[in-house]
Amino acid sequence: MMDTDHTEIIKEGEAVVEAMALLQSRFRRICVFCGSSQGKKKSYQDAAVELGKELVARNIDLVYGGGSVGLMGLVSQAVYNGGRHVIGVIPKTLMPREITGETVGEVKAVADMHQRKAEMARQSDAFIALPGGYGTLEELLEVIAWAQLGIHDKPVGLLNVDGYYNSLLSFIDKAVEEEFISPSARHIIVLAPTPKELLEKLEAYSPRHDKVVPKMQWEMEKMSYCKSCEIPGLKEGNKATIQAQRGSML
């Protein structure tokens, strides 16, 4: 009887430790790239909802592309329903196409795709890509390239649902083999088949790749650029606004 009680106490203690670990995530916000379509398989849709719930369980807010359709709509709704903050960033031109019905959370309208990606990156502590098309792939590869260049050191996660990204991974391995991508840069991508496993890996992530340029050098260059591009005669208020817009994306 005492052995049984002791076992139960240990199990309860382990559950408390696990719950505390979830509450103490290193991330405040994670940016999720995903399709504006739901995809052919139900597993893609299930993964989007599951990812949203996993973010909620870890008290992490969502940054995403702002749409209410496709996988974007599913993951944002799951996070919002769980009581976490949602920030959607979307170009005004895409609003009629990617927003239908009621939106959730905070919607930031921007002028174009470049501003969208910069704002999403600026707001986030890490990145995750769900299945998606050209847009998702472009967003994913850009943050990978930025990490390789040393612009940021934020984790980049790939949720490889049902092997969706196997062909992309084969291409990257081929590029490493042909010496277009360095072996160390292959470690930029954090890979997992489920949201829970991916979040656990992202929490433990530490950069292992060789950066082309140190991050500090990028930041110093940016500060120098902001100062050199001041417009003579510009009012202080407007000058501060422009400099803020040129400020750190990441």
From Swiss-Prot:
<comment type="function">
    <text>Cytokinin-activating enzyme working in the direct activation pathway. Phosphoribohydrolase that converts inactive cytokinin nucleotides to the biologically active free-base forms.</text>
</comment>
<dbReference type="Pfam" id="PF03641">
    <property type="entry name" value="Lysine_decarbox"/>
</dbReference>
<comment type="similarity">
    <text>Belongs to the LOG family.</text>
</comment>
<protein>
    <recommendedName>
        <fullName>Probable cytokinin riboside 5'-monophosphate phosphoribohydrolase LOGL6</fullName>
        <ecNumber>3.2.2.n1</ecNumber>
    </recommendedName>
</protein>
<dbReference type="GO" id="GO:0005829">
    <property type="term" value="C:cytosol"/>
</dbReference>
<keyword id="KW-0378">Hydrolase</keyword>
<dbReference type="GO" id="GO:0005634">
    <property type="term" value="C:nucleus"/>
</dbReference>
<feature type="binding site">
    <location>
        <begin position="133"/>
        <end position="139"/>
    </location>
    <ligand>
        <name>substrate</name>
    </ligand>
</feature>
<dbReference type="GO" id="GO:0009691">
    <property type="term" value="P:cytokinin biosynthetic process"/>
</dbReference>
<feature type="binding site">
    <location>
        <begin position="116"/>
        <end position="117"/>
    </location>
    <ligand>
        <name>substrate</name>
    </ligand>
</feature>
<dbReference type="GO" id="GO:0102682">
    <property type="term" value="F:cytokinin riboside 5'-monophosphate phosphoribohydrolase activity"/>
</dbReference>
<dbReference type="InterPro" id="IPR031100">
    <property type="entry name" value="LOG_fam"/>
</dbReference>
<feature type="binding site">
    <location>
        <position position="98"/>
    </location>
    <ligand>
        <name>substrate</name>
    </ligand>
</feature>
<dbReference type="InterPro" id="IPR005269">
    <property type="entry name" value="LOG"/>
</dbReference>
<keyword id="KW-0203">Cytokinin biosynthesis</keyword>
